[in-house]
UniProtKB/Swiss-Prot annotation:
It catalyses: 3'-dephospho-CoA + ATP = ADP + CoA + H(+). Keywords: ATP-binding, Coenzyme A biosynthesis, Cytoplasm, Kinase, Nucleotide-binding, Transferase. GO terms for biological process: coenzyme A biosynthetic process. NCBIfam families: dephospho-CoA kinase. PROSITE patterns: DPCK (PS51219). Its main location: cytoplasm. The gene is coaE. This is Dephospho-CoA kinase. It comes from Saccharophagus degradans (strain 2-40 / ATCC 43961 / DSM 17024). Its EC number is 2.7.1.24. Pfam families: CoaE.
Length: 203
């Protein structure tokens, strides 16, 4: 398997902005947010389990999952959140491993908001934290998702703290300034990771 670089960050940190900058450099990105959506598509076992638990009212008219309704349920009851994770996390991990193994680029990015909160970090060789301060997280996430400040803060409370994330990271990208500033950091890390991948290949 290629060298795996985990990229994580709190809600509103701009993690996806950063990982999107690696793709034009020829680097494959495995995004667990997208995989999490795949495993609850119609006809998938995870969606069938969710429908059995909450009934057909958890679905939209077209048969897709009503994400807002499910999100409201799991935020209101921690036991429901734990149940949902017990159903979806194994499926997400299985598909994530398949995609990482199939990657053909010199190294591969594993993008995950819960990299350090779950066992996904065990799939990585190095970890990059995308960092902004908490006030920027709330402002950006609210503008992007239209969620209330309370909902965003509830998500932040379920994620590892900013300090703990930075302590566990091998590299940090400061995403609090301009896109150009972020891009220059990505370019520098790309050089580092390419050299690391080459060194591993030559062993």
């Amino acid at each position: 398997m290629a060298l795996v670089i985990g990229v994580t960050g709190g809600i509103g940190s701009g993690k996806t902005t950063v990982t999107n900058m690696f793709e034009p450099l020829g680097i494959e990105v495995v995004d667990t947010d997208l995989i999490a959506r795949e495993v609850v598509q119609p006809q998938q076992p995870c969606l069938e389990a969710i429908t059995q638990r909450y009934g057909p009212q958890i679905l939209l008219a077209d048969g897709n999952l009503n994400r807002k309704k499910l999100r409201d349920i799991v935020f209101a009851d921690n036991s429901e959140r734990l149940w949902l994770e017990s159903v979806t996390h194994p499926a997400i991990r299985q598909l994530t491993v398949q995609r990482l193994r199939a990657a053909k680029s010199p190294y591969v990015i594993l993008s995950s908001p819960l990299l350090l909160e779950t066992d996904q970090y065990t799939l990585t060789d190095k970890i990059v934290a995308v960092d902004v301060d908490e006030a920027q997280q709330v402002e950006r996430a609210s503008a992007r998702d239209g969620q209330s400040v309370e909902q965003i803060q509830a998500i932040m409370q379920k994620q590892i703290t900013r300090q703990a994330r930075l302590a566990k990271a091998d590299y940090v990208i400061d995403n609090s300034h301009t896109l150009e500033h972020t891009h220059s950091q990505v370019q520098a890390l790309h050089q580092t990771f390419t050299m690391l991948a080459t060194a591993i290949e030559q062993k």
